[in-house]
Curated annotation (Swiss-Prot):
Pfam families: RecR_C (PF21175), RecR_HhH (PF21176), RecR_ZnF (PF02132), Toprim_4 (PF13662). This is Recombination protein RecR. InterPro entries: DNA_Rcmb_RecR (IPR000093), Rcmb_RecR (IPR023627), Rcmb_RecR_Znf (IPR015967), TOPRIM_dom (IPR006171), TOPRIM_RecR (IPR034137). It comes from the Bacteria. Transmembrane segments: none annotated. May play a role in DNA repair. It seems to be involved in an RecBC-independent recombinational process of DNA repair. It may act with RecF and RecO. A zinc finger (C4-type) spans 57-72. The gene is recR. Residues 80-175 form the Toprim domain. One of its GO terms (molecular function) is zinc ion binding. Keywords: DNA damage, DNA recombination, DNA repair, Metal-binding, Zinc, Zinc-finger. GO terms for biological process: DNA recombination; DNA repair. SMART domains: TOPRIM.
Amino acid sequence: MLYPTPIAKLIDSFSKLPGIGIKTATRLAFYTIGMSDDDVNEFAKNLLAAKRELSYCSICGNLTDEDPCAICRDESRDQSTILIVEDSRDVSAMENIQEYHGLYHVLHGLISPMNGVGPDDINLKSLITRLMDSEVSEVIVATNATADGEATSMYISRVLKPAGIKVTRLARGLAVGSDIEYADEVTLIRAIENRTEL
């Protein structure tokens, strides 16, 4: 169906979001058009503010509105462990269970030979630099249980083991192919408690 240009553009914009198909984008567009001007302005203001005010922590790579982020600034956290995750949503998932009290490092992707993504294409160099100047004795790899997650964890293990840093992986309470951000709290707690050395 042909829609007026402003609606078509709005549908196109919504459909660019991950997991949003044309039907959902159309629903969102029509819902937005039906909102009050104040609500639309508030939505647009919040969207622009998030885009403008958020950046990545210069230490761990987590999404933050201050640099360094609150987690890196918190001296009460266990400075001897770093949990490596794919993206900031995984940090939120781990923080929500309140079981892990160490530091984080966000990779912003995974090594994916099939997609041409190598170690230099993700946030690994800053991890190596960070480990040189720290008291970290254990790195916990918490990448998703996928082929790319496994490739990334094995690479990290190969690079860090010669430096004498213990490298562990979350236990396999997580189903193969599953994403950490969608795992329930009990599964994540057990995965941390029963992590295995790589």
